[in-house]
Amino acid sequence: MMSEPTEKETTMTAKLDPFAVAPSLMKSWMGTSMAVASSLEASLIELVKIRASQINGCANCLNMHTKEAREKGETEQRIYLLSAWREAPYYTDRERAALGWTEALTRLSEGHAHAGAYEALKAEFTEEEQVKLTLMINVINGWNRLAVGFGLFVDPEAAKSIQAKVAA
């Protein structure tokens, strides 16, 4: 059974600490998040997490996922240029399809998911991968909303400690 995160692990200036208020739901949410994140290549997942977090203005998730991307071998150049991925020559067609789909689903309030984004997705991803990627986009958007909504800012090292407890 997962023990509760310590104060050091949740160094946040939060309006509300969901880990303290709803620990079993947060454990389940983290388990889902980890399962989805492991279902596609790590480099792609980190780009998706960063791009959605840029759109949503989530400092917590940007801090965490840019660090994780670097640790997994992502280059500074690709991280810096991610918000301008359409103009930058450093992304594969598969990454471009994933980033386009990420933007379409993250910006639903600006209109429906664009047919062009889905066509690009279909060209690069199997149907199963399309579902996995869509779930990943939903997960990171959920984390963004928790972090922004409740004012969470968790140190990336502390987040790893919490993830390890969930995995145990």
Task: Specify the residue positions occupied by each region the protein language model found.
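Hydrophobic alpha-helical segments
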Residues: 1-168
